[in-house]
């Protein structure tokens, strides 16, 4: 490994609203908005030609466990009223915030999108059961990419530093959400499941690691509470 390495991290949070039928290609909310579901648009389960020199795709069972465990540790911390950070903080305790469980369908759709190596959000990712939110992160290195999934998740969560506690009762509808959306999706009270995908690939001098996590039901609805505050 080179003794001199460059690193960068870019993260995005978002949500796409709508419901879908079992047949991804017949999703009305996609068609109505001129969009195509990820599973319909990209039919191959192998990485696309846009992933130049991809090395490996997917997550190990241990990494999946880490993703779920870390999310739940963070959710429990906030729910218990132990998160003192914010702008201003502290973050209020939650009346209820269930633990997340791993969802294979969410993971399948997330991996399909990751396999395109197109940084950003896919146009339509919902499943029949619920609407789906999404956090996306990419981390690059000029040497060996040793970033871990927990580091990428913690980078999302670090947006709590910018979270005004008043937004817990009403998620902002202006561009403020771009600064806090990763954090709020992680702790969204109505979200119960998570599924993620990941790929390593080469982009010029950068060795990229691209992580996509899908959440259901989705969070980050304007003017709606992030979670119910404990009275």
Curated annotation (Swiss-Prot):
Domain SCP: 68-215
Top-level taxon: Eukaryota
Expression tissues: Expressed by the venom gland.
Disulfide bonds: 25-40, 30-124, 51-117, 196-213
PROSITE patterns assigned: CRISP_2 (PS01010)
Carbohydrate attachment residues: 145
Principal location: secreted
Alphabetical keyword list: Allergen, Disulfide bond, Glycoprotein, Secreted, Signal
Signal peptide (residue range): 1-21
Protein localization: Secreted
A GO cellular component entry from the record: extracellular region
Family the UniProt entry places it in: Belongs to the CRISP family.
PANTHER family linked: CYSTEINE-RICH SECRETORY PROTEIN-RELATED
UniProt-recorded name of the protein: Venom allergen 3 homolog
Source organism: Dinoponera quadriceps
Lineage: Eukaryota, Metazoa, Ecdysozoa, Arthropoda, Hexapoda
């Amino acid at each position: 490994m080179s003794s001199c390495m460059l690193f960068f991290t870019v993260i995005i949070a978002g949500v796409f609203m709508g419901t879908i039928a079992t047949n991804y290609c017949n999703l009305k909310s996609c068609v109505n908005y001129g969009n195509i579901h990820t599973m319909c648009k990209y039919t191959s389960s192998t990485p696309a030609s846009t992933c130049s020199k991809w090395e490996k795709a997917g997550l190990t069972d241990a990494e999946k466990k880490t993703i779920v465990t870390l999310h739940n540790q963070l959710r429990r911390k906030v729910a218990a009223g132990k998160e003192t950070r914010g702008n201003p903080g502290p973050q209020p305790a939650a009346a209820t915030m269930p633990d997340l469980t791993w969802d294979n369908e969410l993971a399948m759709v997330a991996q399909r999108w990751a396999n395109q190596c197109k940084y950003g959000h896919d146009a339509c990712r919902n499943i029949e059961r619920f609407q789906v939110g999404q956090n996306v992160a990419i981390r690059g290195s000029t040497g060996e990419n040793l970033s871990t999934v927990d580091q990428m998740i913690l980078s999302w969560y670090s947006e709590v530093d910018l979270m005004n506690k008043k937004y817990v009762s009403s998620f902002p509808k202006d561009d403020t959400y771009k600064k806090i959306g990763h954090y709020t999706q992680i702790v969204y009270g109505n979200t119960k499941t998570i599924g993620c995908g990941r790929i390593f690939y080469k982009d010029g001098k950068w060795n990229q690691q691209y992580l996509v996590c899908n959440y259901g039901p989705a969070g980050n609805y304007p003017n709606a509470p992030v979670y119910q505050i404990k009275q």
